[in-house]
Amino acid sequence: MISGVVFITAGEPYTRDACAAARSVRDSNPALQIDLFCDAAAAVPDGIFDRIHVIDTPHRRSKVDCLPLSRFDRTLYLDSDIRVVADLSSMFALLERFDFAAAHAHARNRSQTNARWRHDIPDAFPQLNGGVLLYRKCDKVQELLRDWAQSFSDAGFAKDQVTLRELVWLSDVRLFVLPPEYNVRYPKYLKVWDEDEAKAKILHFKTFNSAEDTNRRKRPLKSLFGLFKG
């Protein structure tokens, strides 16, 4: 069983961001293999990724096309705006009992987060955040991922999580919902959690994307990130 991390990017700015994210994986999980699917391989320095796979027909959600192509038996997909700050081996152990794992979407009261595709789904089954996805290679998951790619193309939503929610709801994959420390979406959470509540494992902040105009927020973020660097 080979476990590994996959990044998928379209566009050179996001590819550069993925390089920074991958370095954080290397620092905290040196034994993990890391692959990149991208359309800007020339922007990638040597020594960061184990393998680079070129995307021939990139688009803003190339992720959904490439997830089924992972060579790993157990895959952790990460967005490019992520920093890994702890050992992740226990995540892969989840796949001994479950097929697919993700955290709930955080902004669950937004209209786009509650968007309906084809079927009404209970509010108590919210969207899953697509930036941290853990899955095992099996027929059920491969079918789910291929259906997700097709549905994103057909449905016309700007966000890919709308169709994922319904597909998972209708699927018989064994789903595990990751606790929030495995997908910390906002720096403010780090200010209110005490040491007995949770220890962040994966930081998933928009401010880690250089492609975003977020310079005004990066100084306080650096201070928070420094908590994990010793």
Which residues fall in each region the model found?
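Glycosyltransferase catalytic domains, chiefly GT-A lineage
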Residues: 1-230
